[in-house]
Amino acid sequence: MSLKWCDSLGDSLMPSLCVRQENREAKIARVNMKAVASPQAQKTPTIAKIPVRWARTGIFVAYTAAGCWIALGLESIIRPEQENYRDWLWLAPFLLTMLTFYFVHMVQSGVGQNMERAGFYFVMVASVLALTGNLGVSLEQRTLATLGFPWGAVLWTVGLMGFGLGTWQAKVLPRYVALTLILLEPLSILTGVLLAPVSPLHPRGGYSAGVEKGLCLALIGMGLRAIMTRDKDDA
C-alpha cells in the first residue's frame, strides 16, 4: 500500500491502516538516513579509488630520492669546497623527485581537483626547465643555464605551491604532505643560508640544502604509506 493510495482513497476507507503505513515508511526513511550517516557509509570515495600500485611504488621512489638528497647534502657539508661533479650527481635525486611527484599526482588523480592537476603540470614543466638549465651549467652553455635560473627555479617554487594547495583540497594524502610541497623550496633556500657558515654558497657544485629536500621527500613517502595503511584499515 502506498502513501499515494492513502491520500486519494484510503483516508476515507481505512484511516488507521494508512496511519500505520505512513509510520512504517517514515521509520524506513530514518533507518536509511542513519545508514548514510554512519562512518562506514561515509568512507571517502577518494580512499576507495586509490591505485595501490601507484602508492606502493611512490613510497619506494620517495624514500630513494630522500636518501640520494641527504647523501648529496651531507657530502656538500663535509666537503664544503665547490665540486662541479656534484652538478651531475644532482640529476639522480632530482629525477627521482620528479617521479615521486608523478606518483603523488596519480594517487589523487581520481578526485579531479583542477588546482592539483594544474599545479602538477606546472611543476613538471618547471622541472624540465631546471633540468635543462642544470645541463647548461654543467656544459657551460649560458643560454641553457638561464632556463634553470631564474626561470626554472621561480616557476618550480610557484608550481609546488599550487601543487601543494591542490593536494590539500584533494584530501587524499595527509595534510603534512601538502604543507611539505608548499614549503619545500622556501625551506631549501633557508637551509642553504643557515648552513652557509659551515658550507659556503657557491655559484655551482654545492648542495648542502639537499638535506632539507631529503627530509621533505621522506615526509612525502610517509604520507603515501599512511594512505595505504588507512586504506587497509577501512577495507
Question: Where are these predicted regions, by residue range?
Answer:
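General structural signal for secondary-structure boundaries
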Residues: 13, 22, 228-230
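Hydrophobic, aromatic-enriched alpha-helical segments typical of multi-pass transmembrane helices
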Residues: 34-234
